Curated annotation (Swiss-Prot):
It comes from Klebsiella pneumoniae subsp. pneumoniae (strain ATCC 700721 / MGH 78578). Signal peptide: none annotated. InterPro entries: Amino_acid_transport_2, Hydroxy_aa_transpt, Thr/Ser_transpt_TdcC. It is found in: Cell inner membrane. The chain crosses the membrane at residues 22-42, 44-64, 97-117, 140-160, 163-183, 207-227, 259-279, 319-339, 366-386, 389-409, 423-443. This is Threonine/serine transporter TdcC. NCBIfam families: PRK13629.1, stp. PANTHER family: SERINE TRANSPORTER, THREONINE_SERINE TRANSPORTER TDCC. It comes from the Bacteria.
Length: 443
């Protein structure tokens, strides 16, 4: 085959779309759509209409460029079957491997704490408002919920993974159905409150600060970084030997782009539908109550006077149940990653990396006790979930998703061709702005 024919074949292949590409597009999309999405409308709608319109413009670039940067880092390793830890070790040595292990663990573990608080608050809200039952002791509720999840994890891990995979699409479908079903309840409150003469760019409630804080929740909600390494390995094994690495990179970018479009469309439609049904004041109230937006919607419809429609009655009960299922799904998914990361840290620093010195059962037990114990402490303390996301969850995700790839592009010879690009500045800015939230929360 001539060079011209080879290039033509490669271009034709890029335009073709395989079943595996669709599978991975939906897989990336499904990974990102979880419990974090239930808090995005609260932060996005907190400042009113103009900030959420700005976030709408930023949503796709944040989702696409940041995940593409991480995918390029994963693609830069010499071994097509090597994961991100191996690739970082290749570029930066064993120290880099330790750093990435820490980053992965501390990027996921705080999410479990967030979900621990969320599931406790969601259950207690459902118990008191929808079931009209007397208030329960918070510590006992958190402990029982965590023990229930620990029991399921310990005795039914394989079943849990299978059930999680089945729950992804019903949850996404429920978000779309709820978004559409809320349309008859839309009102103009958020538009009526727009007064151009009162709009401030700066200040605590200004547009810039609101959007800045909104970037953190976007990084948190539009995040499928945990699966990017596996995705890249799969695509390299499928395409690289036949078409080369450059083609594989373009194919990965194409898949990430389509997954990002799907994700942004579903999440932003859900956020706008919630905002037009409620109001910025309602969103502030939801933040103060420390509950996800579905729980607040359930309480909102429960407090409606007069004869309720069938949908209002269904949503009153269904929204909290959907939220509970979503949080359970997200907790289980992130627990597996946290367990793997903590097991690796204990093995590396407690047993010098010697797997023969400790059984997997003992390792899993030690990790479970720490994970569930720390989650219970945080759930009992009940810190504000959005503050926890903005000060801890999102900054650590940003360091892995945004700053690590940018540092690698600057230092690694195999990534030199990506230097000096405008999208690198954008990804770096998103990472730094997200991390600077820590300073804002402190002062």
């Amino acid at each position: 085959m001539s060079t011209t024919e080879s290039i033509a074949s490669s271009q034709t292949s890029l335009s073709s779309w395989r079943k595996s590409d669709t599978t991975w597009t939906l897989g990336l999309f499904g990974t990102a759509i979880g419990a974090g999405v239930l808090f995005f409308p609260i932060r996005a709608g907190f400042g009113g209409l103009i900030p959420i319109l700005v976030m709408l413009v930023l949503a796709y670039p944040i989702a696409f460029y940041c995940h593409r940067a991480l995918a390029r880092l994963c693609l830069s390793g010499a071994n097509p079957s090597g994961n991100i830890t191996e690739t970082v070790e290749e570029h930066f040595g064993k120290t880099g491997g330790v750093v990435i292990t820490f980053l992965y663990f501390f990027a996921i573990c705080p999410l479990l704490w967030i979900y621990g608080v969320t599931i406790t608050n969601t259950f207690m809200t459902f118990w008191e408002n929808q079931l009209q039952m007397p208030a329960l002791n918070r510590g006992v509720v958190a402990l029982l919920l965590l023990l229930l999840m620990a029991f399921v994890i310990w005795f039914g891990k394989d079943l849990m993974v299978k059930v999680m995979s089945y729950l992804v699409w019903p949850f996404i479908a429920s978000l779309v159905v709820i978004s559409l079903s809320l349309i008859p309840y839309w009102n103009s409150a958020v538009i009526d409150q727009v007064n151009l003469s009162d709009i401030a760019l700066t200040g605590h409630d200004g547009i810039l600060v609101t959007v800045w804080l909104g970037i953190s929740i976007m990084v948190f909600s539009f995040n499928f970084s945990p699966i990017v390494s596996s995705f890249v390995v799969s695509k390299r094994e499928e395409y690289e030997a036949q078409f080369g690495r450059e083609y594989t990179e373009r194919k990965c970018s194409q898949i990430i782009s389509r997954a990002s479009m799907l994700m942004v469309a579903v999440v932003m439609f859900f956020a706008f539908s919630c905002l037009f049904t409620l109001s910025p004041q309602n969103m502030a109230d939801a933040k103060a109550q420390n509950i996800p937006v579905l729980s607040y919607l359930a309480n909102h419809f429960a407090s409606m006077s007069g004869t309720k429609s069938t949908f209002a009655t269904l949503l009153e009960y269904g929204a909290s149940i959907i939220a509970l299922v979503a949080i359970f799904k997200s907790f289980f998914g992130h627990y597996l990653g946290t367990l793997e990361g903590l097991n690796g840290l204990i093995l590396r620093f407690g047993y010098k990396g010697d797997k023969t010195r400790v059984s997997s059962g003992k390792l899993n037990t030690l990790s479970m006790v720490f994970i569930m114990g720390s989650t219970w402490v945080v759930a009992y303390a009940n810190p504000n979930i959005l503050d926890l996301i903005e000060a801890m969850g999102a900054p650590i995700i940003a360091s892995l998703l945004c700053l690590l790839p940018m540092y690698a592009i600057r230092k690694a010879p195999s990534l030199a061709k990506y230097r000096g690009r405008l999208d690198n500045l954008f990804v770096t800015a998103i990472g730094l702005l997200t991390i600077l939230n820590i300073v804002y929360k402190l002062f």
